[in-house]
Amino acid sequence: MYQARPRRRVQAPLILLPVLLLAAACGMPNRVRSMFGGQLPIQVTISPDANENSPLAVELIVVYEDKIVDKLLEKKAREWFSGREQFLRDYADDVDSWKWEWIPGQEIQPLELSYGMGAKRVVLFADYVTPGEHRAAIDPQKPFRLVLGQSEIALEEVR
């Protein structure tokens, strides 16, 4: 004799999936986005007198391991740029990296970078000719404006 079995177990995930997708799309806490990866919107402003009126290399690194975040936050920009190739080879599976070179006063269209699941931190380095750390860090879930001033780098959260 055949007995119908309740389908609650199948229905619950099917009902839950659209709810989770809707919640993620509507701005569920930013940490959820980090768990699954996402898009990182970035605005860039470059001062007309940035870097003593010389082109400025900038690198953005999305980091997926806390120990690597700590290593990067110990580095000054000059150290980063001189050893970046080896660092990226050593930690190829634990970071994503984007590099640009901009000129003072250049207008940059808004950027949107894709990052993977489990991103811990975004670290940026700017290769100014003047001495200094020239490093900044922010959560990957927070849209931001990168401000490249005359002799320093700054990040501003964008709401």
Language-model-derived ranges and their functions:
Residues 27-29:
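Bacterial signal peptide processing site
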Residues 33, 121, 130-159:
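Glycine-rich, aromatic-bearing surface loops/beta-hairpins
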Residues 47-49, 63-65, 116, 127-129, ...:
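Solvent-exposed coil/turn segments that connect beta secondary-structure elements
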Residues 74-115:
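Tryptophan-paired
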Residues 108-129, 134:
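Helix-rich interaction surfaces within compact, conserved domain-sized segments
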Residues 41-78:
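Early exported N-terminus immediately downstream of N-terminal targeting peptides
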Residues 2-15:
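Bacterial N-terminal signal peptides that target proteins for export
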Residues 23-25:
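C-terminal motif of bacterial Sec signal peptides marking the signal peptidase cleavage site
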